[in-house]
Amino acid sequence: MAHGPDTVELLSRISAIRDGTLDICLLNITSLPKLPETLTHLDCGNTQLSVLPKLPETLTYLDCENTQLSVLPKLPETLRELYCENIQLSVLPKLPETLICLSCGNTQLSVLPNLPETLTYLWCHNTHLSVFPKLPETLTYLDCGNTQLSVLPELPETLTHLSCWNTQLSVLPKLPETLTWLNCPNTQLSVLPKLPKTLTWLNCSYTQLSVLPKLSETLTYLYCENTQLKILRNDGESIADYSKRWDDWRAEQVYIKRCGEKCQVIRYELFDAADF
């Protein structure tokens, strides 16, 4: 290991570890020495690392984002959080059963290993994924946008955030009653499933939708630019009529693009009318 200024700083930080945490983010280093056996938290993101040494069995947190890594070593069974975005990773190792958070977006991944039953947060956007394993029942946050996915598995009843933008999806599975955020623009969707009453944010722009299901009373934002929509609600009211009486409900603004006799929604936002 060359002993440049940042390497000296690295060795100094390793020798000074007191709470099990090693933060070497942004250091200009290409390799690491043997790591302390008591290490619990390792942040080596935004470095020039191309390989990691054996990871301590005590490790619970690993951040290696924005590095030159293309392979990860065996992950310790104690690991709870793994952040490996923006690297050249094409395969993930076996994931420990303790894992709660996995961030592996902006990588070369084409498949995911079996997901642990403890997983709560999953970011796998901007990858080559075309199929998903079974989703754990504990999952609350899923971002699988800008992938090759054409179908989603059954969604867990705990899910609150689903982002599946710019995919090959033409249909969505049943949405859980806990969902508050649905982001599905740039897809092949022509119909949406029943929307949960908890939904506060919906983006279905750049889809083939021609009608929306009943909108929840909790909805705060609705983006439906460049769709085939002519009706906002199931009572048959046209967009043009609806926009004339926006203050009767909670509509902040409705942007209308007219094409002859047709109206196309550009953006539709909701807010609490009491704010005026």
Regions found by a protein language model. Give the residues of each.
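Concave beta-strand-loop units of leucine-rich repeat
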Residues: 22-28, 43-48, 58-69, 79-89, ...
